[in-house]
């Protein structure tokens, strides 16, 4: 294996684990530290102008938080990378709508880095992600055949 291939694999590992950690703690904080009710309270006022009721907002934020928590863990360990990235991309669309109701979209300093990490990881080929459970399981399936 060439040095460049290891560098690619390590770069993907770094991006995948950092992205996983970011989303994991984002979901964890909303679920266990800040609590969903407080997050709903924060967004209820700005979203009231769109006539979005808290009864819709609460399960939406809870689902978003669970997606961030679970997909963050999966990205961190490298299991189900693509499906996790798809769920997180959909989650970011929801987050973009919620946050853009509060302030201008271009002022969302935390949104765009996460979006960029997801897009870059989606461009990475699975066979380049050497240090992941997906790769390990795929290798063991191929060896067993």
Could you say what each language-model-derived stretch is?
Residues 1-38, 52-66, 70, 77-145:
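Extended, low-polarity transmembrane helix blocks
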Residues 44-47:
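Juxtamembrane inter-helical linkers in multi-pass membrane proteins
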């Amino acid at each position: 294996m060439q040095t460049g291939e290891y560098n690619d694999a390590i770069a993907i590992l770094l991006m995948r684990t950092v992205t996983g950690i970011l989303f994991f703690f984002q979901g964890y904080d909303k679920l266990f530290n800040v609590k969903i009710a407080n997050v709903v309270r924060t967004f209820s006022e700005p979203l009231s102008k769109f006539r979005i009721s808290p009864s819709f907002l609460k399960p939406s934020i809870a689902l978003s938080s669970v997606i961030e928590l679970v997909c963050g863990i999966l990205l961190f360990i490298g299991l189900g990378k693509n499906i996790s990235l798809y769920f997180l991309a959909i989650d970011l669309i929801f987050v973009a709508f919620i946050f853009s109701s509060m302030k201008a979209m271009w002022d969302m300093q935390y949104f765009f880095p996460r979006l960029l990490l997801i897009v870059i990881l989606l461009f990475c080929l699975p066979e380049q992600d050497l240090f992941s459970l997906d790769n390990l399981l795929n290798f063991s399936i191929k060896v067993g055949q």
